[in-house]
């Protein structure tokens, strides 16, 4: 992620005066929720994952799913508040001196794009720690490489580099790619069937709300028709597969 941040700041210097400041302020504001979440939930998860790494795979996944449910209940409302009040928060904190109204709007636009990446930052931390607990240290390295590659494709291939809002959006989407890759590796380590059979209803509900949020995020992108279709189909398949496995499990018991 830090490499992406450096590239982002370098590209921002080529847009307009003050772009680096807008991105830096927006990024710092977005990390406030991240800091609260890490201090409150993610750090205690690390100890539980290390303790449960030698247990049954189903028990290990139940620990992950349980913590993800509680984190989603905290982080999603916080993200919604920041999205709704991004301009007001930026204006209250920084509208003084040479920081004018145009700077407020640019910073708030970047903040909105960064906010969508905050849940995926949390997932990256949790999935990485889970894979390390399972002695699969190579997978997080591969996922980080995929994140950097996807960011480069977005800013240079799709040319999302002509505004601070698009640069921040590319950074958030790269985090989404990284979290998805890590989740795929975790499914591979725990066996896909084990994970699907042990999804509780809170995790499924949080998955649905997260998919709705991501869909609306992708709706504003230039290539929304392609990504929205693929993501919507994938998340729908995953949701109904989880329901089917839980139904079959209840029938057996």
What positions do the PLM features span?
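Interfacial transmembrane-helix starts/ends
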Residues: 24, 45, 56-85, 104-111
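Short alpha-helical transmembrane segments in multi-pass integral membrane proteins
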Residues: 70-84, 165-187, 237-241
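Interfacial segments at transmembrane-helix termini and the short loops linking adjacent helices
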Residues: 83-117
């Amino acid at each position: 992620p830090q490499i992406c941040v450096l590239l982002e700041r370098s590209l921002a210097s080529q847009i307009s005066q003050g772009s680096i400041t807008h991105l830096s302020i927006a990024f710092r504001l977005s990390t406030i929720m991240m800091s609260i979440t890490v201090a409150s939930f993610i750090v205690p998860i690390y100890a539980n994952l290390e303790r449960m790494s030698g247990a049954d795979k189903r028990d290990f996944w139940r620990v992950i799913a349980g913590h993800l449910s509680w984190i989603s209940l905290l982080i999603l409302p916080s993200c919604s508040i920041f999205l709704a009040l991004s301009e007001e928060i930026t204006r209250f904190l920084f509208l003084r001196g040479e920081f004018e109204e145009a700077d407020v709007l640019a910073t708030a636009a970047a903040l909105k794009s960064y906010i969508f990446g905050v849940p995926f930052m949390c997932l990256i931390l949790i999935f990485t720690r889970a894979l390390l607990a399972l002695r699969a240290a190579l997978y997080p390295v591969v996922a980080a490489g995929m994140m950097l590659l996807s960011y480069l494709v977005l800013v240079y291939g799709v040319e999302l580099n002509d505004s601070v809002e698009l640069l921040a959006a590319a950074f958030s989407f790269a985090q989404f790619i990284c979290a998805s890759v890590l989740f795929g590796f975790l499914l591979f380590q725990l066996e896909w069937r084990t994970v699907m059979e042990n999804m509780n209803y809170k995790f499924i509900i949080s998955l649905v709300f997260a998919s709705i949020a991501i869909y609306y995020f992708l709706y504003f992108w230039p290539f929304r028709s392609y990504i929205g279709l693929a993501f919507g189909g994938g998340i729908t398949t995953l949701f109904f597969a989880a329901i089917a496995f839980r139904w079959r499990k209840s029938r057996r018991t």
